[in-house]
Amino acid sequence: MKSTLRPALVLFAVLTLICGVIYPYAITGIGKLAFSEQAEGSLVSRNGQIVGSSLIGQAFSSPQYFWGRPSATSPMPNNAAASSGSNQGPLNLALIDSVKGRIAALKAADPANTLPVPVDLVTASASGLDPEISLAAAKYQAARIALARKMQLEEVQSIIDRHSKAQYFGFFGEPRVNVLALNLALDQHH
């Protein structure tokens, strides 16, 4: 028994050291060297104060700000620890009701807006934490924000254009914009 127990314990100790200590520290070190901002959470700070992460959406509800995608992490919106999609199918009555409610809220916030409501403003993403919205979703909200901030519509659209990102590799996804970056730019501008 001693002859089989000793190699098993040695193997256990060696693998614990490699997999539990050496590998995690090595990968963390490489990540911090190669991708220092991302390894630290892609935190965004303003005046020395951390205001969010560029990788995790935040809940904005003031008419003076761009609103992101709905969060699927309830009861706390945009809770990274509870990241997941809603798992509701397109025929699920709960999904249909929540989409109708979100459309009604968007229409109530900007009754003069006659544009079609972009789908990403009424449906959660697969992770439930998307920090970005489509350009259509940003432009849909531009008039409401301009009115609330007493800005020219062209100024808001210019901020959207300056912060827009192209498709990944020129063909994956669609042009998009980070909601936190837009809102910080609005605060800085006005």
From Swiss-Prot:
Keywords: ATP-binding, Cell inner membrane, Cell membrane, Ion transport, Membrane, Nucleotide-binding, Potassium, Potassium transport, Transmembrane, Transmembrane helix, Transport. NCBIfam families: kdpC, PRK00315.1. One of its GO terms (cellular component) is plasma membrane. The system is composed of three essential subunits: KdpA, KdpB and KdpC. It comes from the Bacteria. Its main location: membrane. Pfam families: KdpC. One of its GO terms (molecular function) is P-type potassium transmembrane transporter activity. This is Potassium-transporting ATPase KdpC subunit. Belongs to the KdpC family. It is found in: Cell inner membrane. Coiled coil: none annotated. The chain crosses the membrane at residues 10-30. Part of the high-affinity ATP-driven potassium transport (or Kdp) system, which catalyzes the hydrolysis of ATP coupled with the electrogenic transport of potassium into the cytoplasm. This subunit acts as a catalytic chaperone that increases the ATP-binding affinity of the ATP-hydrolyzing subunit KdpB by the formation of a transient KdpB/KdpC/ATP ternary complex. It is a single-pass membrane protein.
